[in-house]
Amino acid sequence: MATLTNVNDKIIAQRALEGFTEYLHPMNLFSTSYSDETKNKGDTIIVPLVGTLTATTFNQDYQVGGGTLTAVTINLNVHKIVPLSLTDVQFANSSVAQLEKWGFQAGQALATAITQHVFSYVTSGSPSFFNTAYTYPVASWNVSRIATIRQAMTVAKVPMDNRSLFLDPTAYSQTLSDTNISYAMYAGTNDALREGRVPRVYGFDIRESNLIPTTDTMYGFACHPSALALAIRALAPQAPSAYEAAGVVTNAETGAALGMRRHYQPSNGTHYLNFEAIFGATYGITAGLSRIAFR
């Protein structure tokens, strides 16, 4: 089986993994299953939902059925690739910096495609699983709205840890410029001013995203990891020996992995590189996510 033994292959694959991991990071706020094991399209993965265990009274027996972990089954039914072609001269003479740039962009593009797929489950155009619970005009969005959302989620018994709030650039900018955030900055953190980054607010990790679907004028959503589940695997090549290089690179910390394969076409002197993953997503617990829109 061909592997990633060529120095250039290793460089570009490693940078692709770094771009993939960095841009996939927001997906860690959902229930996920990542692994370096290869799978085929159509295979299924069982993913436990975060925060669904419950306690039961001990009755002199540890073999009890209570406390069963809720899980969902995900079909790996989506296959995305990021293609890159280089002539043999380009490939041989590419600088390390160029290879790193191409690799990072390829990983970023693959992670973006996965994020867009997961976010499509939040729209009302998909099965009516989540409610549009909050209908604030975008112009009126501020930190006090987050406090209202927090209270409603707590009353609905959504776990109080691991909550996150995704906002489009407009709503995020208004959060960033809110005077309460400014006061917090003066109290000790200058992330808002220096990095343009909103810190945690009222128990929520605040995330800016320009990938939030605008269906029904949605501009954000509040969620718990139990709301959505995602599984990602590398695709197993059908004929590994047919490639100049083929392999899987894995992030040791998160387990996120992507596949890379390269083949050469002598007729036009071109190397074809493809970075890929197969994945799937599904709904978890209804109360775990609420859309925010202006109507």
Where do the protein language model's features map onto the residues?
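Extended, compositionally biased alpha-helical segments that mediate assembly or anchoring
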Residues: 252-295
